[in-house]
């Protein structure tokens, strides 16, 4: 194996927990801007869905309105379950970026249909359409896994998307409640006998469409493809975004009238400026040099591109659903089931009137805390604020000190006692009940914000290859959607039966039993290193002896002495691990180029 001489070695980037200069901030920020559009749109309907069903006049029984409102909500979840695998596989075939953008467009279409819905069936179809056309939950997890491959960076990165969801889930309901029925709430601004009077719930949906269009534009211009093969394709949207950034920053990059490609003066372009670059795991266009195809530009045929060369050099697609992948998907489904069941049970428990029946301890008792709606809303708002804080700071701290799998198991061990103790809050003195409720809510959110990102990291690292990561995350998203659809339904039935029989603990203890099952199952799970790193290491032998022509500008296969020095000393090229005995670095005069510098996305 070839080792660089000591005098050519430069201090390499460390990827430890204290080195955050290489953290892919820009791409995660762009991804977060795309992500926040969805919870805003999804959660905006909840403040007015009851009044929307009431306006449809489908029933005269007020008690059944909640049932029909639940049907509208569940139609999205079941549709999302049925389409999750499809979108995951589609992202493996055409790339992550197109699927993410199509998901945002599909959500926008469903919001328009929902705003114009004249009856309950149309509203349900609109929500189902949103679930069918949007598979972004699994694809987003895949994209994060491919952007962040340094293990020390994963806890921080995987806490960002849940934080963004929490933020959007606060903005969405506030916006939906404020903009619904504008002719009634803002008669000075919205006149009667207008479109907003005929469709009183159209305005919040139109605003959501504007937000989603913003997400589409941001994604099209600035989001990079992360698929291991599709990222080498030419991306006109990203080129346009880079051109806009360059124009705004006063760069010399310009777009000519005759050529739509971005042209850079070759004498001024610094291809090997590695003064402050990320570690080898991050190959992003925001910091890496633009690479030319492996072949001479002049020798390329119309169908010859980097993506095709990479496909030819890589082995076939490995089996996606290995034993560890299946274990992780099952764990994700179990976690989603009992977590969403708690979210449904706790407001019902808090609002249920106190029972005057005689208690037969330790198991036979009913009733709730009888809290007013305003108090419950404030408690849940406090829970949401704490959730955002815990996502960003608590989860990375805990995982960094205890490890992902160990943390996940500890959380699952603590969770069942919480479920089993919550119904006993009715037995506490009234003066202690409020504090106990806050303690239960904070405990649940603490476990929640640690468990879900942990499963995402474990699942991403268990994937045998990034080429099947989309299918794996699609299956996980479908499993979670099914669990979130079945959980509230089954738990609601158990809670009703428990109140009728006098045992209100039935639903809570059933959730605890499901969690215990997940705890036992977690001991068959194993923690793996990020697969993208091991793939690179495994391919080092196959790349040995191949001329590293793609590291130089188009039409130039050999390096100048200055380029030799920078190439060998760069942190970007892992020549420590390569046999480059066949690498020819003989200095020759560069061949004249008739074409401008060609860019190939890295």
Curated annotation (Swiss-Prot):
GO terms for cellular component: membrane. Keywords: Membrane, Transmembrane, Transmembrane helix, Transport. The keyword Membrane applies. It is found in: Membrane. Residues 527-602 are annotated as: Disordered. Residues 528-538 have a biased composition (Basic and acidic residues). GO terms for molecular function: transmembrane transporter activity. The keyword Protein biosynthesis does not apply. It is a multi-pass membrane protein. The chain crosses the membrane at residues 29-49, 67-87, 98-118, 128-148, 160-180, 201-221, 329-349, 378-398, 411-431, 439-459, 468-486, 505-525. PROSITE patterns: MFS. InterPro entries: MFS, MFS_dom, MFS_trans_sf. Induction: Expression is induced upon voriconazole treatment. Pfam families: MFS_1. Belongs to the major facilitator superfamily. Major facilitator superfamily transporter that may be involved in A.fumigatus adaptation to azoles such as vorizonazole. This is Major facilitator superfamily multidrug transporter mfsB. It comes from Aspergillus fumigatus (strain ATCC MYA-4609 / CBS 101355 / FGSC A1100 / Af293) (Neosartorya fumigata).
């Amino acid at each position: 194996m070839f080792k660089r001489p000591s005098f050519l070695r430069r201090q390499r980037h460390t990827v430890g927990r204290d080195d955050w200069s290489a953290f892919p901030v820009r791409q995660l920020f762009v991804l977060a801007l795309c992500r926040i559009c969805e919870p805003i749109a999804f959660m905006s309907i909840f403040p007015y869905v009851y009044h929307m069903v009431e306006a449809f006049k489908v029933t005269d029984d007020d008690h059944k309105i909640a049932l029909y409102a639940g049907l509208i909500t569940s139609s999205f979840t079941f549709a999302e379950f049925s389409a999750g695998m499809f979108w995951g596989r589609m992202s493996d075939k055409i790339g992550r970026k197109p699927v993410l953008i199509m998901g945002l467009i599909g959500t926008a279409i469903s919001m328009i249909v929902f705003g114009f819905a004249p009856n309950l069936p149309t509203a349900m179809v609109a929500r189902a359409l949103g679930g069918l056309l949007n598979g972004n939950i699994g694809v987003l997890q895949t994209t994060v896994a491919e952007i962040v491959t340094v293990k020390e960076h994963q806890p921080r990165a995987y806490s960002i998307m849940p934080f963004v969801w929490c933020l959007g889930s606060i903005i969405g309901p506030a916006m939906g409640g404020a903009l619904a029925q504008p002719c009634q709430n803002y008669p000075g601004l919205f006149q009667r006998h207008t479109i907003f009077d005929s469709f009183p719930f159209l305005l919040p949906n139109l605003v959501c469409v504007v937000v989603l269009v913003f997400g589409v534009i941001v994604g099209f211009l600035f989001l990079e493809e992360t698929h291991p093969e599709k990222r080498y394709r030419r991306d006109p949207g990203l080129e346009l975004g880079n051109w806009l950034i360059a124009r705004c920053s006063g760069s010399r990059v310009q777009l000519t009238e005759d050529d739509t490609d971005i042209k850079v003066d070759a004498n001024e372009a610094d291809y090997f400026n590695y003064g402050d670059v990320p570690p080898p795991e991050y190959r992003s266009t925001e910091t890496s040099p633009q690479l030319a195809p492996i072949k001479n530009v002049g020798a390329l045929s119309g169908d010859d591109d980097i993506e095709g060369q990479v496909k030819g050099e890589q082995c076939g697609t490995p089996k996606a659903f290995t034993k560890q992948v299946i274990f992780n998907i099952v764990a994700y489904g179990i976690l989603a089931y009992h977590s969403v069941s708690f979210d449904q049970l706790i407001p019902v428990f808090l609002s249920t009137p106190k029972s005057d029946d005689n208690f037969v301890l330790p198991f036979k008792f009913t009733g709730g805390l009888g809290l007013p709606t305003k108090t419950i809303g404030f408690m849940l708002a406090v829970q949401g604020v704490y959730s955002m804080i815990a996502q960003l700071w608590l989860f990375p701290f805990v995982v960094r000190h205890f490890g992902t799998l160990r943390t996940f198991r500890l959380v699952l061990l603590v969770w069942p006692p919480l479920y089993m103790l919550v119904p006993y809050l009715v037995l506490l003195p009234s003066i202690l009940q409020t504090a106990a409720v806050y303690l239960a809510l904070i405990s649940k959110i603490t476990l929640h914000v640690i468990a879900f990102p942990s499963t995402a990291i474990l699942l991403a690292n268990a994937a045998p290859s990034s080429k099947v990561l989309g299918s794996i995350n699609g299956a996980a998203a479908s499993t979670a959607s099914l669990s979130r659809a079945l959980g509230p339904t089954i738990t609601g039935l158990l809670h009703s039966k428990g109140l009728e029989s006098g045992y209100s603990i039935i639903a809570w203890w059933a959730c605890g039993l499901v969690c215990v099952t997940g705890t036992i199952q977690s001991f068959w799970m194993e923690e793996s290193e990020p697969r993208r790193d091991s793939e690179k290491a495994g391919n080092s032998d196959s790349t040995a002896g191949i001329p590293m022509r793609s590291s130089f500008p188009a039409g130039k296969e050999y390096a100048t002495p200055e380029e030799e020095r920078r190439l060998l000393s760069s942190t970007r090229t892992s020549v420590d691990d390569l046999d480059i005995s066949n690498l020819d670095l003989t200095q020759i005069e560069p061949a004249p180029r008739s074409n401008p510098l060609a860019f190939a996305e890295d």
